[in-house]
Amino acid sequence: MSTWLLPENIADVLPSEARKIEELRRRLLDRFRSYGYEMVMPPLLEYLESLLTSGGADLRLRTFKLVDQLSGRTLGLRADITPQVARIDAHLLNRQGVTRLCYAGHVMHTRPRGLHATREQIQIGAEIYGHAGLEADLEIQQLMLDALHLAGLSRIRLDLCHAGVLAALLARDAQAAERGESLYDALSGKDVPLLNELTDDLGADTRAALRALPHLYGDASVLDEARARLPVLPEITRALDDLAQLAAQAKGVEVAIDLADLRGYAYHSGAMFTAYIDGVPNAIARGGRYDHVGQAYGRARPATGFSLDLRELARISPIEARGTAILAPWAQDDALGAAVAALRDAGEVVIQALPGHDHVLDEFACDRSLVERNGAWVVEPR
């Protein structure tokens, strides 16, 4: 086997892509900070049980496992940073009020999410802990859309769903609750024949409501249809009201309601929002409420947040990250060295051409030169 081969769905990030990823990372983290989010950096490696406190079987399957040579315990390479941030909020920070946290780091997956997807993503996201009201969901949704606009994306479609609708239907029917996981799978995959089979012997009201969910899809007006077709339960009414407010806030994007779109993170407990871009089949960003995620760490707090993969964002972003630079000669000259240092201190990129190498790679656009004129080093256009 060639020593330069990499595992399937694992790839190096070359300079042009890395530059774009880093530009986007800085833009997004700066925007998060402007909202008041504090950055945290959880470890890439943790004890397996700490990583799998939520997320269900899918997260367990996607997590790489290995044995710790020091303790003999099973470790996991994180496949999702959100549970780690919940642990930090619940156990380490232990604050009583609202906490805003953000992060950016690598995650590893045992299996790719798609045919050409990478198994090493760069996950970036933001979370709000400590506020159960819809205001936190509205802020997170706005921040997610801001992040996509900062990346230069347009023609964004925002899909909205609410985990509380299905939860309310299962809570009122014990027989349906026993089939909760199968119903979840059928709804997520919009497998209507399977859904019909699973609901055939349920009570008439529950059966009709569950079978209606895959068809409650469309613009915000579908919420009126949902109010007519679903049982009048306080939890469902509240969920539909939340979705109406989230849809109204999403200015400048196409909004779709899909009450069966339960794909994604298994730990959602409330509103869920997913962003799609024209021409890209998979979601570019996902978010929502997951109030119970910190319970495994001894302190369940209201929580809502979103995340996306920076590598995928860089792939589809139209922004141009190729920076300009100044080309300078190489010489053991104190005045030249001082001029180069001053330019770099001012934020300029200065590339010194090493002796014998006339060819300059185009990773930076050297649109200016540092030249000596009348005993002084000055910058001139090339």
UniProtKB/Swiss-Prot annotation:
CDD domains according to UniProt: HisRS-like_core
Subunit structure as annotated in this protein's UniProt entry: Heteromultimer composed of HisG and HisZ subunits.
One GO CC term on file: cytoplasm
Gene3D superfamilies the record matches: Bira Bifunctional Protein, Domain 2
Biochemical pathway: Amino-acid biosynthesis; L-histidine biosynthesis; L-histidine from 5-phospho-alpha-D-ribose 1-diphosphate: step 1/9
SUPFAM superfamilies per UniProt: Class II aaRS and biotin synthetases
Sequence similarity: Belongs to the class-II aminoacyl-tRNA synthetase family. HisZ subfamily.
Record-given protein name: ATP phosphoribosyltransferase regulatory subunit
Protein's job: Required for the first step of histidine biosynthesis. May allow the feedback regulation of ATP phosphoribosyltransferase activity by histidine.
Keyword flag Cytoplasm: yes
InterPro entries according to UniProt: aa-tRNA-synth_II/BPL/LPL, HisRS-like_core, HisRS/HisZ, HisZ
Keywords: Amino-acid biosynthesis, Cytoplasm, Histidine biosynthesis
Record-linked PANTHER family: HISTIDINE--TRNA LIGASE, MITOCHONDRIAL-RELATED, HISTIDYL-TRNA SYNTHETASE
Highest taxon of source: Bacteria
Cell inner membrane is among the record's keywords: no
MF annotations from Gene Ontology: histidine-tRNA ligase activity
